Amino acid sequence: MFREGKFNIKKYRLFIFVILLLVIYIFLLKNDWENSHRGLTFAMLDVGQGDGIFIESPTGTQVMFDGGPPRKVLGSFSRVMSPFDKTIDALIITNPDADHIGGFLDILKNYKVGVVFESGTLTDSKTYQSLREEMKNQNIPDILVERGMKLDLGGGVMIDILFPDRDVSEWATNDGGVVARLSYGKTSVMLTGDIGAKTEKIILSENSEAQLTSTILKVGHHGSHTSSSSSFVKIISPEYSLISDGKNNSYGHPHRETLDTLTKFGSKILRTDLLGTIIMKSDGQDVNFSFHK
C-alpha cells in the first residue's frame, strides 16, 4: 500500500547533482561537436577494399557516397557523426557492386534516410536486391541521377552530376557509375566511383577544364590501372589524390602505374590502407586533413 509522505530532498541530493552534471556534460558535448563540424567535412572512411565517403555541409546536410562492403561503415561513423544523430539526408550509389553498397543496408537499419540516388546500372546480386527491398519497405524515394543535376547541400556546398549523360542500364556497373564534382568556395572534389578510361574520355569531351579542375581527386576504382588515365589526371590537376583500398588486398590496389601517373602531375597521395579514415575539413578557402586508424 502506498503511503503518503514528504519527499526527502536531502536523501537524493547527490543523485540529483550527478544527473544535473550529466545533462550539462551532454549539452556541452553536443555543442562542442556541432561547433567543430562547421564548414565542409569530407571523409573517406576506412571501409577496407571498397568505397565509403561521408559529406556534411555547414548547414548539417549529410550525404553518403557509397557505403563500402558489408559490416564496415558503421564502425567509422564515430569519427564523423555525433552519437545523437540518427539521420542521413541522402545516399548516393555510384555503382551497385557489393564493395560500394554492402554497408548501405546497415545504414538503412540504423538511420533514417531521406532519399537514395543512383546511376541506373543494373545487377541481380543478392546484396543489391536486399537493399532495394529495404528501401521499398521504408518508402525511401529512389532517384536516377543524370548529367546537369545539381544537389544543393546548403551553406554554399553543391554537388554537380557529370555522369551518366545517357541510359546506362546495360552498361558495365563500373563504367556506368555516377561521376560528380563537389564544390564549396575554392575547395572542390572530383568523385569518380569506379569509372575507367572509357567514361573518363566522355567526361573530358563534355566538360571544360574549368568545370573539371579540382582540389581533390577521389581516385577511380581504388587505384586500378584501368582508371586515372594521364589525360584525365592532367585536366583534373588535383593537389591531393585520395585512394580507398584495403590493406594487402588481393587486387594489388593501388597499382604502380596509377601511383606513377598521380606523382607525375605533382599530386599528394593519401591512402586509407596506410592512414585509416581520411577527414578533410574546409572553410571554403583552405583544406586541412586528419587521419584516424
Predicted regions, residues:
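Non-globular, low-confidence helical/coil segments that flank catalytic cores
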Residues: 1-293
